[in-house]
């Protein structure tokens, strides 16, 4: 088999791309993944779901701790800066990336960094790189974006979506 030819190439390393790649590999297929971010995991890991949920969970824990009479009797309420809480979310993202990277490495699935562009029905190139890959089949799992309902001003400084909530500074 040629070095840059695979049974299946998965474009995207988020949850759907990861599942497709792992399932194909478990069925004995040669698989490669194209990832347009510096690290695997897609927007779910880096922008939206995981970091925003980690942030929300951390804030809820601090609030519950400070509201719990058992802990209140121990002294003053715990004060954590927003930056400390954001660092926790960053740590969660780091752990997710490491775990997902280990999945790919353990299953011997190569990751190619870059954005894919089809040259024909069996060939893609990595944009900005001199790399072409071929496959018998492709899975396009490029993810989604936050929904912005009409009538909500997302340019307002106090309105955030799951991709921008981590840009808060306080």
Per-region residue spans from a language model:
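The conserved SAM/SAH-binding core of class I Rossmann-like methyltransferase domains
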Residues: 11, 34-35
């Amino acid at each position: 088999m040629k070095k840059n030819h695979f049974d299946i190439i998965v474009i995207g390393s988020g949850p759907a791309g990861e599942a497709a790649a792992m399932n194909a590999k478990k069925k004995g297929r040669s698989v490669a993944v194209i990832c347009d971010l510096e690290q695997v995991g897609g927007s779910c890991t880096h922008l939206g779901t995981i970091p925003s949920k980690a942030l929300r969970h951390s804030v809820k824990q601090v609030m519950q701790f400070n509201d719990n009479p058992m802990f209140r009797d121990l002294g003053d309420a715990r004060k954590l800066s927003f930056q400390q809480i954001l660092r926790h979310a960053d740590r969660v993202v780091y752990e997710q990336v490491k775990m997902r990277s280990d999945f790919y490495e353990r299953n011997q699935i190569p990751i190619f960094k870059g954005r894919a562009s089809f040259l024909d029905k069996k060939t893609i190139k990595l944009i900005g790189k001199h790399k072409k890959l071929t496959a018998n089949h492709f899975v396009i799992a490029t993810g989604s974006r936050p929904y912005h309902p009409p009538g909500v001003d997302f340019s307002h400084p106090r309105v955030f979506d799951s991709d921008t909530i981590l840009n808060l500074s306080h």
